[in-house]
Design a protein with these regions (language model features):
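Divalent metal-binding segments
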Residues: 1-166, 183, 187-243
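Conserved helix-loop functional segments at active or binding sites
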Residues: 226, 249-253
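Short, conserved active-site loop motifs that form the nucleotide-linked donor/cofactor pocket
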Residues: 178-180
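Accessory "access/gating" subregions that flank catalytic or transport cores
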Residues: 171-176
């Protein structure tokens, strides 16, 4: 009933739920802002009311090719056209409750170390880190969280490699025994497999569509080399055999 924030449902997938885009969502919910967060977590589908609430216009999508205004569809890096306009994600009460649930599950499972392999995916890493730190360090669960910065966060915020290294060094200096950064950095090679956006070699997808490169090979190479030279352990998001081949070839050059 609260129309000041969107109603967000996670888990949508057309194989199970049918095709739903902006037109269908607007017809179902003409007044309530609604966002479907795809099962892959790499796609957002929104209705008219959500676009109006977030004050997103078609002009805002210039420079964001992985978007479809007519369909209200934002996927992979195209999601960064929406994410900065969604500060409610970091509402302390809402985010804190989610983190508390996570810490409780970690405790119940006997897990003592958990890694976040995409710190900054919501476009505001400092807010994210502060909320994680507040929840974890105020918890009695004997667990620690290791946070891993991700290439797409820095690129979406137009940071240089040098600025990224400086920022991560600052975060590392602020580490505690419960929430810490160490020398880890994550690359993003191809898109989500649940979204059919992974990169495959022949014969590829049977309908002929192609996957998505999250970051160009040339840019990925530069960032990987810089962080490798700085003594970082590299992690990579890769799904299809085409992207795995690119990653292996990249590692051979380091």
């Amino acid at each position: 009933s609260d129309k000041t924030i969107p109603f967000i449902a996670w888990g949508y997938h057309p194989l199970w739920h049918g095709t739903l885009f902006r037109e269908e969502l607007t017809e179902l919910f003409p007044d309530q802002p609604v966002m479907l967060w795809h099962r892959s977590f790499h796609e957002l589908i929104v209705n008219d009311a959500a676009l109006n609430l977030l004050e997103v216009t078609e002009a805002d999508l210039v420079g964001h090719p992985l978007t479809n205004w007519a369909k209200g569809h934002f996927y992979e890096n195209g999601m960064y056209a929406l994410i900065p306009k969604m500060p409610f994600i970091f509402d302390p009460a809402r985010f804190g409750k989610g983190m508390q649930n996570f810490i409780q599950m970690v405790h119940q499972g006997g897990v003592t170390t958990a890694l976040d392999m995409g710190t900054g995916v919501f476009g505001n890493p400092d807010a994210e880190i502060n909320l994680i730190r507040h929840t974890v360090e105020s918890s009695q669960a004997p667990a620690r969280i290791i946070l891993t910065p991700i290439i797409t966060d820095f690129i979406s915020r137009k940071r240089t490699i040098e600025q990224a290294v400086q920022q991560i060094d600052k975060w590392r200096d602020e580490s505690s025994h419960r929430v810490k950064f160490d020398r880890r950095f994550k690359l993003m090679i191809d898109g989500a497999i649940y979204s059919g956006l992974a990169q495959f070699k022949f014969p590829g997808y049977i309908d002929g569509h192609e996957g998505v490169w999250m970051v160009s090979k040339e840019v990925t190479q530069r960032w990987a080399q810089a962080f490798w030279d700085a003594g970082y352990q590299l992690h990579a998001h890769t799904n299809g055999d085409g992207s795995a081949e690119v990653l292996i070839d990249l590692l051979k050059t380091l």
